[in-house]
Every structure is written in structure tokens, then in C-alpha cells.
Amino acid sequence: MSTSEIYQGLACHRLTLSGGDTVLVAMQGAHVLSWVSQGRERLYLSPNNRWDGHSAIRGGVPVCFPQFNQRGTLPKHGFARNTLWQAGEVVTTEGGLHIDVTLRADADTLAMWPQHFEAQLRVALTPGQLLLTLTVHNTEAQQDLLFTGALHTYLAVDDIDLTDLQGLGLRPEWDAVADVHGVADAALYFDGEFDRVYDAAPQPLTLQDGSSTLQIEQSPSWGQSVVWNPGAEKCATLPDMPADGFAHMLCVEAAQVFEPISIPAGGHWVGWQRLTVS
């Protein structure tokens, strides 16, 4: 089943399976706001968001495009997350539903970034699983399209002190807080601000949150995985986060941080992230 609804003033589409799994997608930014599976909310969404229709939304799954963070001249994490996308038809598949949400270059985007493009996020819901697939088309006739970005997924956890992430062991690691390069431990634990970029692992990651386990996979077309938690001190400085918000979330992002992805004229690129309750 699919329904249209207004959530905090934003136009949204909700997909619901017969077993109770649901996903809520806002047209602002093609932003996944909620994913409920096996009776539990799996994504963290800050209660302190402004919900004004153009400010970035803290939580859920922001689509960062065509720039990661502040690594360029565009607004932080690019313009896609603050821009209105267009919803397509909801499609019923074997065991699930999906919807495609599309952003095309227009006068506003071209004023910031002189590049013709089409970006599409497919949100696919099946029992116990959410698959997000970002496709970027270069609609220029001659020039290459270069971009960085991420699916900046905020996962909900009961208590960050009792949470660990496995699967990145021995992968090259950049600790952005200390600006130190190294290799990852077999299991990551979170005590204070944590902001690290890893060479993407070929195998699934496992998030252990008390008695709950979530598998996290990404396509090899993403170069990196980013793991982020602001910790108590930094969280207290974020106006769109409650003081204890850090204790209930962990970002695990499919990302392209350093070297831009290059799409030839008329070509396209596909990158996905899959979350599975296990």
C-alpha cells in the first residue's frame, strides 16, 4: 500500500507492507525520514529539526549531492538535500514496493552548478530490508560530470555506549577529528566524538545494538564508508539536535569523499546502500 501525506509540513509518500514494515519519503531532498521494520524504528530523526521546507533535515537518510561536506564551493553536502524532488509511480514488486524520486537540473541548480543532470533515488522496501539506489545521469552533450556525495544514513540505536560496528577491520582509516591515518579495529566502539572515513569494505558491516543486529551493505561504486557520531560535547553545539541525541544515533554512510566520480557525457552512475534486519 502507498499513501501521500504531509509530515511536519512536507509532502511525503509512505510505502507500507502487509507485515507492517513502512518507509516514509519526503519530497524535499528525496529524504527518507522513517523506516520501521519488525515493529522498530530503524532510523534516527532529530526532534529539533526546523521543518521550514528548505533547511537541511537532521536524521533519516540525507542524499548528499553533488558535493560531500564542505569539499568544494557548493553549500555543505550539496544542494540536493534542500531541493524539491518529483515522485514517480509506486511499483509493486515480488514481496515489496518501490518508488523513484527524481531531481533534474533547472535554473536554480544551474546557477550554483553549471551542469545538466538527472538524479534518481529508488526507495525499495521489502520485509526486513530497505534498499536505496542513487542513479546519476549526465545529460550534457559533451562535458563530463564530476561529483562527490553520500547516502548519509542516520541509524537509530538504543544506547551508543552499548553499540558496536564490525566489518571494517584492517581497512585504511582517516580519523577526521585527530587528522590521523591508520587502520580500523575489528570492532568500532564509540566514546566521544567519532568521525572517520574508511576505504569501503567488500563485505557487509554488522551493527550490534543491544539485542538488535543490522547488516549494512553498499555497492562497490562508492569509494568510502563514513562512520560518524558527534559525541556529547559537539552534540551540545548543534542547534538541530537535542543534547542527548548523540546517544541514540550512529551515521554509517555510503560515500564518495575524496576523488570525484566522473560520468562521461550521456552516461550514468549507480550507487546503492542496503540495510537488512538480521
Language-model segments: residues:
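Acidic-aromatic substrate-binding/catalytic surfaces of carbohydrate-active enzymes
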Residues: 21-76
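Hydrophobic residues positioned within well-ordered beta-strands of beta-sheet architectures
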Residues: 13, 23, 99-101, 119-121, ...
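Extended, loop-rich substrate-binding clefts of extracytoplasmic carbohydrate-active enzymes
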Residues: 3, 7, 75-127
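Hydrophobic residues embedded in beta-strands of well-ordered beta-sheets
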Residues: 11-13, 32, 97-99, 130-132, ...
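Active-site/ligand-binding surface loops and adjacent short beta/alpha elements
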Residues: 142-225
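Asparagine-centered strand-capping/turn motif at beta-strand->loop junctions
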Residues: 134-140, 277
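Short acidic/polar mixed-charge low-complexity motifs
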Residues: 19-21, 31, 40-42, 115-117, ...
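Beta-strand-rich recognition/accessory modules
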Residues: 1-18, 28, 106, 118, ...
